[in-house]
Amino acid sequence: LGDVYKRQVLIVAPLSGHHATLLRDTVRTLLQDHKVYITDWIDARNVPVSEGEFGLDDYVHYVQEFIRFIGAENLHVISVCQPTVPTLGAISLLASAGEATPASMIMMGGPIDARKSPTAVNNLAEQKSHDWFESHVIYKVPPTYPGAGRRVYPGFLQHTGFIAMNPQNHLQSHW
């Protein structure tokens, strides 16, 4: 087992309201040969509005902190979908500051340049205005949660979108 734990992986999971459990098969596979770390973000509905906003800069900073905490030596970072851009930013900023950087950075399924190989999501983004998205996919957290009033893109919408794009794969992965 000693050699296994020399190889470390940080999986940077998506932030958008669902949990890292969606990556359990990836983690299970990587655990055979690596010490695995994975991010699991607090659902925004549980963060009081008084805690302030959370933006791209914060996301990048957290990824940097994870890398520093684990240690970049023998670390491989895998970002899955949404966090590819913040992960690229975090590692690039570490490098530009002369800090240690991971041995590798693997970006899976994330749009670094969404203009290349556009998808149905890109087409929707080009067809609809910013105001349309604000009024159709951004909701206030209900009063029953600590984050009441916080404006969020709910994870259930993201997850439903994933299922709608490839229903057969999702059905097979759970049955």
Locate each region found by the language model.
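Short beta-strand element of the alpha/beta-hydrolase
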Residues: 7-14
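Conserved acidic catalytic loop of the alpha/beta-hydrolase fold
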Residues: 46, 58-75, 88
